[in-house]
Amino acid sequence: MNIIDRFEQENISKRTANKKIPDFEAGDTVKVTVKIVDRSIEKDGKEKLTERFQAYEGVVIAKRNRSITSSFLVRKISHGEGVERRFMTYSPIVHSIDVVKYGVVRRAKLYYLRNRSGKSARIKERHIPIAKTKAAKA
């Protein structure tokens, strides 16, 4: 293992010490909680930082596994418009990732969902036995 790989592995282990990243694939519906920091200037000129968490729920249409630069693309329909957002898997901005539903798809990248709407954009649900889900949570 060279120096760069070792550095990336150490960095990943530091970033995942507090949070658990579940196994998910393209087609799964995930809920990503993101930390948002707002900066505002008060009347007396002081800068005020406020933190809040925002949930983003949608279907994973692509996943990119590249060690520390791994990312995934989530698509949701908001007010009739398709919205896509890419999240860096090991980013400190990503607070948590929860799998809501597991989907059955035959592709690794689901970019064809961009051209579909309504019933044709649905994804079948994959049922996982209870024993596996309990073992994964423990």
Curated annotation (Swiss-Prot):
GO biological process, one term: translation
Top-level taxon of origin: Bacteria
Coiled-coil residue windows: none
GO molecular function: structural constituent of ribosome
Record key words, sorted: Ribonucleoprotein, Ribosomal protein
Entries under Pfam families matching the protein: Ribosomal_L19
Cellular component GO terms held in the UniProt record: cytosolic large ribosomal subunit
UniProt-listed PROSITE patterns: RIBOSOMAL_L19
InterPro entries to which the protein is assigned, alphabetical: Ribosomal_bL19 (IPR001857), Ribosomal_bL19_CS (IPR018257), Ribosomal_bL19_sf (IPR038657), Translation_prot_SH3-like_sf (IPR008991)
Family: Belongs to the bacterial ribosomal protein bL19 family.
Its biological purpose: This protein is located at the 30S-50S ribosomal subunit interface and may play a role in the structure and function of the aminoacyl-tRNA binding site.
Name the record gives this protein: Large ribosomal subunit protein bL19
Gene: rplS
